């Protein structure tokens, strides 16, 4: 948990009337929703997820999805950006449930997060209006400019909400070899650069062939496939 540094990008209450319809959304931040009234749908991983009142929803960063809303729909939204994610994105190591039942405490936490961050609401629900590099940088700046007490309380609330999903999450892969774990950290940190297989093998103290075999044994992927997948995710 010492490596998890979630930052609040946006928090607020949104009310829609069949006007929450956006296709092929994919963002560098995680979305949490608490549905208060009405219903809507999300198309994610090829499946339709119905959004229901008194439930919370988790959409991981870099996950393509679409929104479908044909009637009244009210929900709290929370956008979380993981600081230092290029080095080691802790949330990326887990498979989270999309839906969990919500409690009165969850609702109170969302409401409190709204109360202490009134300037972090979305001006428009259209993802193209806020899911871009300029707005991301502006939101990160707003986050940094808050008082220390607001930062501490906000992060504490985000930890509590994430913990609710972590209770039902499954670890994606358990790395038994520290050399492969370090290689993955290096890949994430340098994902925007050209990553040479020879460099990874050398840092691990292994030959290329041995490194490839060990990497695949630990992750189920070859180093090249893993790097390509991460570059695609980053580019989306």
Q: Locations of the language-model features?
A:
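Generic protein-terminus/edge-of-domain signal
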Residues: 1-55, 61-63, 69-72, 87, ...
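Short beta-strand edge segments in extracellular beta-sheet folds
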Residues: 79-81
């Amino acid at each position: 948990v010492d490596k998890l540094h979630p930052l609040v990008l946006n928090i607020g209450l949104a009310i829609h009337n069949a006007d929450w319809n956006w296709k092929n959304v994919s963002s560098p931040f995680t979305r949490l929703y608490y549905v208060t009234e009405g219903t809507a749908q999300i198309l994610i991983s090829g499946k339709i997820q119905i959004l229901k009142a008194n439930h919370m929803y988790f959409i991981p960063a870099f996950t393509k999805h679409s929104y479908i809303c044909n009637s009244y729909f009210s929900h709290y939204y929370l956008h979380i950006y993981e600081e230092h994610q290029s080095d080691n994105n802790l949330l990326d190591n887990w498979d989270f449930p999309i839906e969990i039942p919500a409690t009165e405490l969850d609702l109170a936490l969302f409401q409190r997060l709204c109360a202490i961050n009134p300037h972090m609401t979305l001006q428009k629900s259209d993802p193209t209006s806020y899911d871009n590099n300029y707005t991301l940088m502006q939101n990160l700046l707003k986050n940094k400019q808050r008082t220390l007490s607001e930062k501490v309380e906000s992060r504490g609330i985000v930890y509590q909400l994430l913990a609710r999903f972590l209770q039902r999450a499954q670890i994606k892969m358990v790395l038994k070899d520290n050399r492969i774990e370090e290689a993955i950290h290096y890949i994430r940190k340098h994902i925007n650069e050209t990553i040479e297989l020879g460099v990874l093998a050398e840092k691990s103290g292994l030959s290329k062939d041995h490194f490839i075999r060990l990497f695949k044994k630990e992750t189920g992927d070859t180093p090249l496939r893993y790097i390509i997948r991460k570059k695609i995710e980053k580019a989306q």
